[in-house]
Structure formats: C-alpha cells, structure tokens
Amino acid sequence: MDKKEIAQGLSPFVMMAFVDAQNLETGFLTRHRINKLTKEQIMGFSMETEKIINKLSHQLEQVADGNIPTDHECGTIFQYVFDKVTEALYKLLMGDEVDTQFNLKEAFDYHEPDLPEYIQLKLTNVVGKIGLINMKILHYLDENNARTNDYDSWLPAYLMVAVIIAIQFAQEIDPDDDSEMQAYLDN
C-alpha cells in the first residue's frame, strides 16, 4: 500500500470515535460541539499539527534504528498525540497562549497535560476507547503489511487519526462542566 492508500484506509477509523450503534466499544464523541471552530481554523490547526506529526515521525525513525515500533510504543505515541492536540486546542479555544510542545521523549515518560484537573479527567475517561481504536488501526495496518520501517509511508497518517479525533473532542469539552470530577470525588 502506498501513502495515499494507507491514509484513505485509515479515515474510517476516525468514525469509530463517534457514538453510534456500530461503535458501542469505541464511541465517545457526540458531534455536540460546545466550542466550535470554523473550517478555516480547523484546516489551519490541522496543517500546523501535520507538520509536528511529520517531525515526530522523523524523530521516531531516527531513534528506532530500522525497527518497527511495537504495539505498545505505537499506542503510547497515539495517546500522547491525542492528549497534546487536545491540550493545544483547548488552550486555543479558551483564549490561552498555546505553548504546547511535542517531544517524543516526553511520550515515553510520564506526562500530564497542562490542563485543569477536571479537563484531565475527561481525557482519562476516554483512554480505553482511544486504546481500542488504536489497536484496531494497528491490526488493519498489520493485516495490510503497511506497518513497516518506512515510517513516512504510514506513521503520519496513523497519528493524524489521533489528531482528528482530538480536534473533535476538544470542541466537545464544556469548560464549565466539572460533573465528572464531582462524581469522581464523591466516590
């Protein structure tokens, strides 16, 4: 599969994140955007994020020494990208300075998004679903012999799925709703 075919093949995995009868295990997005971005804003943010994703891919390729990343390594990076994009977009939507940095080493160390705790809890509550989507994508890539040591052919498209899901997720976050945190504290 070439780069374009891989990207096209991965696009349906974004839909797994939406609540739907077909996505009982993976759905968490409702399409109810509290903080809407214009298409132009989304495109601009996506293009900037794509540059960052390409840099991360090249960094990983350099340190991997020709080895294909394991499921665990891929999942860690996928979740990291989801968290960091959510963080950056949340800050943008709240009118805060977007000072979010993407650092490959940080993905494998403990990192805590620079977000209020109740927003971090919203992220924590979808980790399992993000993990399932990630595993389904990796299965698809492996089934099609697309996960190779030619990182440029598959890794950016794979990570862009996390980016697209995070863009929708960040727009659905209600900054005034801390009910998940209250429920957590009550238990």
Where do the model's predicted regions map?
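Single-residue recognition of alpha-helix capping/boundary positions
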Residues: K3-E5, Q41, E73, I119, ...
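Short acidic DE-rich linear segments
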Residues: A183-N187
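Alpha-helical oligomerization segments
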Residues: A157-A166, P175
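Leu/Val/Ala/Ile-rich N-terminal alpha-helices, chiefly Sec-type signal peptides and the beginnings
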Residues: M1-K39
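Detector for methionine-enriched segments
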Residues: M1, M15-M16, M43, M47, ...
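Conserved aromatic-histidine-acidic binding/catalytic patches
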Residues: D2, L37, Q41-G44, E48, ...
